[in-house]
Amino acid sequence: YLVKREMLADTLRQIGLTPFLPDGSYYMLAAFEKDRWPGAVAATESILQQVGVATVPGTAFYRRPEDGDDQLRFCFAKKMSDLEEACARLRRVSRERAARTLSTVA
């Protein structure tokens, strides 16, 4: 459990998200800056389209959906090989975004 949790948390930190570490669940919320994506649904769609990793918008987990509009939920109850692949794909989110930003500026 802890190995998988830390693997995902480290990956999320590498791509600029702030993970909230669970004490016992296999789900992890992670916050993102609103200048990166306009909201949780947009972030979910972007990550799925870019790298094929499914997340759930944080809005689904709050009584007031706007309280979770800067968060995504990730599941790490996966086989280790699947989690390793998902983390590798997630690390591409950061690189692809950086490449697009550089090409836009140039």
Predicted features, each with a name:
Residues 1-106:
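PLP-dependent class I/II
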